[in-house]
From Swiss-Prot:
Residues binding Fe cation: 91, 133, 137
GO biological process assignments: co-translational protein modification; translation
Gene that this sequence comes from: def
Cofactor binding note: Binds 1 Fe(2+) ion.
Protein name from the UniProt record: Peptide deformylase
Catalytic function, reaction form: N-terminal N-formyl-L-methionyl-[peptide] + H2O = N-terminal L-methionyl-[peptide] + formate
Record family assignment: Belongs to the polypeptide deformylase family.
Keywords, sorted A to Z: Hydrolase, Iron, Metal-binding, Protein biosynthesis
């Protein structure tokens, strides 16, 4: 397994729409494993393949405190959503920035697991929010897209400054 490079805004590759996975095979499983390693290394709770420049419909999530409840979503589809909620969301592609984003409180999805087996899942709370956040990535949407143009500009400037400082270090 290896840690992959996470793309940061304003990288336009984050805006690409991911293509469906045609077959869950050893290559896809390796990508899933690398994505988990990357997510844990970056201290995230979710990661979409788009964020690591792989434009396939793959998401990994682990919202557990002990980091031992891996959830793999390949070709996820949103079946139902209900309620309204929101928390201050962060994103590995938008480092050190957070914003309140409106989300559905509960979701029902269908996806394939790491072995290519179909399943349905009903989620609420943090897991539901994380699923929606990561599914947005698969269509090229970022949490900051829900914000005003002024807030988006401020976030972009802060991230670009942070990346410049890290490049010098």
């Amino acid at each position: 397994m290896s840690v992959l490079q996470v793309l940061h805004i304003p990288d336009e590759r984050l805006r690409k729409v991911a293509k469906p996975v045609e077959e869950v095979n050893a290559e896809i499983q390796r990508i899933v494993d690398d994505m988990f390693e990357t997510m844990y290394a970056e201290e995230g709770i979710g990661l979409a393949a788009t964020q690591v420049d792989i434009h396939q419909r793959i998401i990994v999530i682990d919202v557990s405190e002990n980091r031992d409840e891996r959830l793999v979503l390949i070709n996820p589809e949103l079946l139902e959503k209900s309620g309204e909620t929101g928390i201050e969301e962060g994103c590995l592609s938008i480092p050190e920035q957070r914003a309140l984003v409106p989300r559905a409180e509960k979701v029902k999805i269908r996806a394939l697991d790491r072995d290519g087996k179909p399943f349905e899942l009903e989620a609420e709370g943090l897991l539901a929010i994380c699923i929606q956040h990561e599914m947005d990535h698969l269509v090229g949407k970022l949490f900051m897209d829900y914000l005003s143009p002024l807030k988006q500009q401020r976030i972009r400037q802060k991230v670009e400054k942070l990346d410049r400082l890290k490049a010098r270090a």
